[in-house]
Structures are given as structure tokens and as C-alpha cells.
Amino acid sequence: MTTLIADSGSTKTDWALVDDAGQILFTGKTQGINPFHLSDDDIWKILAEELTLPEVPARVFFYGSGVTESMKPRMEHLLFQQFPQAEVHAESDLLGAARALLGRRSGIACILGTGANSCLYDGEHILLNTPPLGYILGDEGSGAVLGKMFLNGIFKGALPESLKQEYLSWSGLDYPSIINKVYRQPLANRYLASIAPFISMQMKRVEEAAASDNSSQHTETLRLHAEALHQMVVEAFEQFYQRNITPYLLSVDSSQNASSLSVAFVGSIAHYFEQPLRQVFEQHHHLTVSQILKAPMKGLVSYHLH
């Protein structure tokens, strides 16, 4: 028996077809399938034209952004139209993250990518979900909010002037074009999140410079950049903890020790900023970070095979 697993965001969907022995028969990508944004025809066209499988699956598990409780029947109906002989299930990307990270164990599952989300999970169901609210009102710790904090810092002087010039040169943008991207162009959240790789690169360059560069002034400038950015990222993750994770810890039954709950993360931001993330959760708040994954597919395959 084969199982088709999908992990879908708004921009792309990752697919994997596996057999009961755990052998991966197919992996591929299609456009993102978000039922909140796409019509039935749009979704059916993606499934019919972009997904070519070597064999028909017996089971389909689709995890996606936009798959709310009210959207589940519609998404499952569309999947059933494409795979009429299969047992089909559609669930939220958050439940997918919890299953990938924690399996059938209880804990706190977090997504830190372009956006942010989290939940308290009992090993089967999501018990609590702090509303993420999006990058304008919330999404603390996300790539979009890191980008927002960075731009605020370089233009208001909280971050070094040399870092501002470095970013403008790296991005090929100036102040008016940045304002245009944020306030007048669509998908500002994706632009803001695209700054995260620059932040990560700057934080790592100081180690490379210290090892290979004899220019002490250059090394000192890089160190200044790295320290300022590290502090900013720690602040972002601290806000994520305080505003999203604290409610779960407060809700845990008094007979349980909240600090015994493990916390796990999936997403590019969690992956690339693992050190400051662990600093906040393990050193500052004494929680156990059990796992950090860049993407959930490996964990989802393991979950559905065991």
C-alpha cells in the first residue's frame, strides 16, 4: 500500500509517495495549494496537471496552510476527485508540523518561517493555538518580523550605519524602493522575510573573518554587526516566547511541571537561527528543545509509517 503525503504552503507544495516499507517512490513539487486563496478549478488544475505519480496512492494525507476546519471538507472533496480510490485526509499545516516534530508525544510545536505559528499538542490533537495574527499584528519571531525589525533598526539608527550601507549594497535597493516594496507592492511579508538570509549571513561572517582575515578593523566591524543582529534576533524570539508560548505553559495542569514540556520547531528561520533560538528557550526559560527541522516532510513520512 502506498501513501501520498503533501506539505503545502501558499507558494509551493512538497509531495512524497512512500510504500509501507518506507521506500520513497516519488518526490516532487507543485504550486502552493491554499483553499483560502484558490478556487476549486485552480486546485483541481494543479492536482491534475502538475502532479504526475508513478502509481495511484491508497492513502492521501494533505497538510496545508488555509486548511481550517471549515475548509477541510472542500479540500478532501477535491483530493477525492483526483484520487477516487484513495482514503483522503486534509489537515492544517500546524497539525502537520506537530505530527512531524512530536509524532505521538505531547509538547509544543512551533512554525518559524515567513510567518509564525504554534500550538499545544497532546500527541493526537491540537489543544490550544495562540492566534499568530499575521506579520502586521503578530507573527513574532517570523522571517517577516525579523525583516521588519531590521529595516526599522537600520533606518532609525538602532543598528550600525555600516550595516545599513552593507544591506543597501547587497539588496540593490534604496530607501524609496524599500518603502514602495513594503507599502505599495503585494506580498510585503515575503519581501520582509527575504531579508532573513542577509541577517544570517552577517551573523556568520564574523567567525569566518576572525579565522582568515588579518584586518582587525574589518573584523571589528563584522563583530559589531553580528552582535547587534544577534541581540535583535534574541529579542524577536523572546517576544515569540512571551506572547505565544507563555499561554500554553500557564494552561498546563498544576499537577504537571510546565518545564517538562518539550518544544520543537520547524521552518527556515528556526533552522538558520538555531543558536539564538536555543539561547532563548533553553538558557533563558529552561525548556527542552527536542528538535529543529528545516522542513516537515521527513517527520511526516516517519509519522505515517509508524
Where do the language-model regions lie?
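Glycine-rich beta-strand-to-loop/alpha-helix junction loops that act as flexible
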Residues: 63-68, 112-115, 261-270
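Short, well-ordered alpha-helical microsegments
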Residues: 71-72, 97-98, 273-274
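Short gly/pro/ser/thr-enriched loop/turn and capping motifs at secondary-structure boundaries
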Residues: 95-98, 117-118, 296-298
